[in-house]
Amino acid sequence: LITDEVYDRIVFDGEHVSFVGSDDERVILINSFSKTFAMTGWRIGYIMSANKEAMTQMTKLQYYITACSNDAMQYAVLAAFENANDYPDKMCAEFKERRDLICSRLNSMPGVQCHVPEGAFYVFPKVEVPGMSSEEVAIELLKGGVLCSPGSAFGKSGEGHLRFAYTISRNDISRGMDKTEAVLKRLRGE
């Protein structure tokens, strides 16, 4: 069982349940500092398992593919652990505010249905624009000043959805949602 727990500190509703401590050698945990300490894009994280053979093989794979992250990134993670252990909780509270804002705005738009996520920092609303694919809608939104991903980028079942990240300020989310609403009205001929 491979358990991806990179969003373990970004949970708004309920509690994160981890497989850590199960002592089951079939469990391999993947985690990241990139999400926890807003180091997105750095791709710095770790793997844990009680399975020594699996860890030996993954260590070899990691060594031959990437060797290690650069020194500056390693020192940044160390500084985060030593000096900013409360940062993830503060960041999570802010992301919850942003989540509530973007979901409220999206759900107030005709033809848009947005599930309220329990964690992470993305929403994946269903967006209905007759005669247009999610990619076409995403391109029109980009022309209107809003960056999002078409749901089809995440597989066939994603068609008809868009993915928005709420990693920007609440003011920028509000401006982005104003633009989104205007573009969707234009596309629907309203």
What annotation goes with each model-predicted range?
Residues 1-190:
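PLP-dependent class I/II
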